[in-house]
Amino acid sequence: MTEKEKMLAGELYDCGDAELLALWHRAKDLARDYNLTNSSDTKRKSELLNELLGKVGNQLWITPPFHVDYGCNIYFGNNCEVNMNCTFLDDNKIIIGDNVLIAPNVQIYTAYHPTHYLDRFTISENETFNFCKTQTAPVIIGKNVWIGGGTIILIGDNTVIGAGSVVTKDIPADTIAYGNPCKVHKANERSKSI
C-alpha cells in the first residue's frame, strides 16, 4: 500500500513520502497563484480552482487567501462561498454540500497525530528533516450550512455553527450549535420546511 493510499484510508502514513511531497508542492504553487491572481480575473481564478480542487461545483466563490495541503481531496457542491483566510488541510476528503457559506478564518483539518511522541516521530541521527507520522479522517459538511469564523467541523444538513466554535464531533442536521466545545443549543426550526 502506498503512503497516499494509507493517508486516504486513515492509516498512519509518512508525510515525507516523495509522491505526497510532489502533490503538496503542486497544491502550494497553485494556491499561491490563485491567491496572487487579480481579484477581477475570474476566468484565471476559475481555471486555477479547477486544476487545484477535486471538484468545483457551479457558482463557487473563494476569497483569497485560501490555503490547502493537497487541494485534490476537496469537493465543493454548487453555490458555495468561502471567505478570506480559510485553511483546508485535506489529507483526506473534505466534501462540502450545496449552498454552504464559510466565514473568514475557518480551519478544516482532516489530519491528526498519535498522542505518544514515539508514535509520531522516527528519530534518526542524520541531518534530514523527519516528518511526523499522521492519520486522517474525512470531513463532510452537509448542504445549506453556514459556518461562522474559526471552526473545525463534521456537521449535518441545514446547520448553523457559531463563530469561534471548536467542533470535535458530529453535529446533527437542522440544528444551531456553538461554543468550545461546540454543542447543539436549539433546533433550526425553519430549515425543516426546506
For the regions a protein language model found, what residue spans apply to each?
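Short secondary-structure boundary/capping segments
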Residues: K4-E5, L52, N130-F131, A137-P138, ...
